[in-house]
């Protein structure tokens, strides 16, 4: 966070969108956001699930999100559970939970099936469309 910068607390959607961009910028794959708002059993308003290509990559992705959220919004996760060797890391920002998994762990735990009743969005597709629009505006 730069000196003198006013920090506003982001909404769950704003924080989720920021985290999705960070993950995409650092080569996370298959980024999906589940909008959990209004679901009684959900612990957060948004769950983000993404895949890293290796155990070290998921560690780097989780660290990068935590660092950039702290820099941009002065927020720290209430918990970061797991480690690269477990093949699944969760960063809990309260209203947004980020799940970073290896391909093997994502296939094993099938979180998309577990949360099937929640609306979901393919973030990679949306981010690609936003990037294309931004490039077209520059021309």
Where are these regions (language model features)?
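Long, contiguous binding/interaction regions
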Residues: 1-39, 53-63, 73-75, 81-83, ...
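Short amphipathic alpha-helical segments
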Residues: 44-46
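Short hydrophobic/aromatic beta-strand micro-patches
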Residues: 49-51
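Anionic-ligand anchoring segments at beta-strand to alpha-helix junctions in alpha/beta enzyme folds, i.e.
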Residues: 66-67
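Post-Walker A helix-loop "phosphate-sensing" segment adjacent to the P-loop in P-loop NTPases
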Residues: 70
